[in-house]
């Protein structure tokens, strides 16, 4: 393969017309030429932290969408499927990822389950983590979500970190809002990165104390605006990530979106491209080429350096996307799963209304919630709905609480994507509709759905209740239709209602969340009653 294009050299910070020659999947030569060129060739983009499962696609199908946006590799935490299926679930992701030329690099997830206050489908202890870390496909210890455990010297958590250190593996962090002396303790334990900084000040402190910061822009958590001002001072210490990206958003853009926004804000081109490609490759030691002689031929050709419209994506010398069309074939996939709950009844979702009721306040574009106290005894409170988490691994009574912020005026929605243990989560306008939505998910053995008295609309997710076995672009369109239905027909106030719903059970991010065991205060790490006595 040989192509002529304007060569973007991130290391020497220069751009010049060049002839790039590829042989046997490697960059054989880069030769300056005098001929003017209309396009630009640069290293492919890398998502430095993503849960592939959140795209609702297995790796082989995720790759088909991602390459259209110039992504050639991901640093992937298989935390979601590990919570459902354990080590066999991680093995599923590894095996499936090998069916595509895309470069997936997986980690060992140390917080399965994320806390002891919820029911998951599996548990990964220090021995299981060690066995994963010894696998050549496992590059790092994934996000250490239990930061209170690290700070307070939890033996299990520290043992997992010690396993990673002994095997010279990188260690990822997850510490929303952690500052001061507690942050120092967390870093001293060996934690190297964080993708959970929500403010400039938080990101700056973490950088100054030695961490690397991942600027996240996902389907729910959006921190780009807050953290982008860090770029000029810390271009070598930053990476871009999406963390959780739903299929409709992945079909629209990926890391190319981060790059476009950063350039539009006037940040230095070479700094931005370093963050999008070089930094994750160097930090994690990825076998991803950076467009140097001898490197694997992983690169993209773009129309210009403003909009970054991807014309070609190349991995190991193979053209894997041209324009917005993938050149990677879909593959047939298996559908392992884990569902052991029974059909639920309307009366399973009865909950007392009281004068001082604890309410979860869901916030748009945020994983954090707020605690509210409302008088529900009169039944006049506006936009207060029931929310439930149903244990899908055992047939037990659901947990029920109240939530504010969804804005539904009709219907109910439910999902088996409920971070991080992935029980069934639902919110709705009546107990009957909530039961209908929950039972729809149970009947499909996983998925997302929107129901009314007359209608049932569902996207089935038969792979662990997390991923579809259908074409990725079809899944993206179906998800977009359901999302639009909830926003427009159900009048949800949220820009991504299913994504926000999926994080209402994530106990490690405050303030109030709901697990299958009850209402949980993520600040004190204790269960609380819905009714304040």
Curated annotation (Swiss-Prot):
What is the organism lineage in this UniProt record?
Bacteria, Pseudomonadati, Campylobacterota, Epsilonproteobacteria, Campylobacterales
Query: Which InterPro entries does the entry mention?
Result: Adenine_deam, Adenine_deam_C, Amidohydro-rel, Metal-dep_hydrolase_composite, Metal_Hydrolase
Give the family, as the similarity comment puts it.
Answer: Belongs to the metallo-dependent hydrolases superfamily. Adenine deaminase family.
Enzyme class of the recorded protein, top EC level: hydrolase
Q: Which domain of life is it from?
A: Bacteria
Which spans are transmembrane here? none
Matches recorded under Pfam families: Adenine_deam_C, Amidohydro_1
Cofactor(s) named in the record:
Mn(2+)
Q: Which CDD domains match?
A: AdeC
Q: Which GO terms describe its molecular function?
A: adenine deaminase activity
Q: Which UniProt keywords apply?
A: Hydrolase, Manganese
Query: Its catalytic activity?
Result: adenine + H2O + H(+) = hypoxanthine + NH4(+)
Any Gene Ontology biological process: adenine catabolic process
Please identify the protein, giving its name as recorded: Adenine deaminase
**EC number(s) stated in the UniProt entry for this protein:** 3.5.4.2
């Amino acid at each position: 393969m040989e192509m002529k294009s304007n060569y973007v050299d991130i290391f020497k910070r220069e751009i010049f017309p060049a002839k790039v020659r590829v042989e046997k999947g490697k960059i054989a030569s880069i030769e300056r030429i005098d001929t003017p060129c209309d396009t630009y060739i640069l290293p492919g983009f890398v998502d430095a932290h993503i849960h592939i499962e959140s795209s609702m696609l297995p790796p082989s199908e995720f790759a088909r969408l991602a390459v259209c946006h110039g992504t050639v590799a991901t640093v992937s935490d298989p935390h979601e499927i590990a919570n459902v299926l354990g080590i066999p679930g991680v093995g599923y992701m590894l095996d499936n990822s090998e069916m595509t030329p895309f470069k997936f690099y997986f980690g060992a997830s140390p917080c399965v389950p994320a806390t002891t206050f919820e029911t998951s489908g599996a548990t990964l202890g220090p021995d299981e983590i060690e066995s994963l870390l010894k696998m050549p496909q496992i590059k790092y210890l994934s996000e250490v979500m239990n930061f209170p455990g690290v700070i307070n010297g939890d033996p299990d958590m520290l043992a997992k970190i010690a396993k990673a250190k002994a095997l010279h593996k990188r260690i990822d962090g997850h510490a929303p809002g952690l500052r001061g002396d507690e942050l120092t303790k967390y870093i001293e334990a060996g934690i190297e990165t964080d993708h959970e900084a929500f403010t400039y000040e938080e990101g700056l402190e973490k950088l100054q104390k030695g961490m690397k910061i991942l600027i996240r822009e996902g389907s729910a958590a959006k921190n780009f605006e807050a953290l982008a001002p860090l770029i000029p001072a810390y271009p070598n210490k930053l990476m871009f990530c999406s963390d959780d990206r739903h299929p409709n958003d992945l079909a629209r853009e990926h890391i190319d979106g981060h790059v476009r926004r950063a350039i539009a804000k006037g940040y230095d081109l070479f700094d931005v491209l370093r963050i999008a490609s070089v930094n994750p490759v160097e930090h994690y030691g990825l076998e991803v080429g950076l467009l140097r002689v001898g490197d694997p031929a992983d690169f993209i050709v773009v129309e210009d350096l403003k909009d970054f419209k991807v014309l070609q994506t190349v991995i190991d010398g193979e053209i894997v996307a041209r324009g917005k069309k993938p050149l990677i074939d879909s593959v047939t996939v298996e559908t392992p799963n884990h569902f052991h709950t029974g059909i639920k009844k309307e009366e399973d979702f009865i909950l007392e209304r009281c004068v001082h009721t604890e309410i979860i306040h869901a916030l748009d574009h945020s994983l954090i919630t707020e605690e509210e106290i409302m008088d529900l005894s009169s039944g006049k409170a506006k936009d207060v709905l029931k929310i439930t988490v149903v244990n899908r691994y055992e047939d037990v009574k659901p947990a029920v609480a109240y939530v504010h912020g969804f804005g539904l005026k009709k219907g109910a929605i439910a999902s088996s994507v409920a971070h991080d243990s992935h029980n069934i989560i639902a919110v709705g306008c009546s107990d009957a509709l909530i039961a209908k939505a929950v039972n729809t998910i149970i009947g499909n053995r996983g998925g997302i759905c929107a129901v009314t008295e007359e209608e049932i609309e569902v996207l089935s997710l038969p792979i662990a209740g997390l991923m579809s076995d259908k074409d990725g672009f079809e899944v993206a369109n179906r998800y977009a239709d359901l999302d639009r239905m909830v926003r427009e027909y159900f009048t949800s106030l949220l820009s991504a209602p299913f994504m926000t719903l999926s994080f209402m059970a994530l106990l490690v991010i405050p303030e109030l969340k709901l697990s299958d065991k009850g209402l949980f205060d993520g600040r004190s790490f204790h269960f609380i009653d819905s009714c304040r006595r």
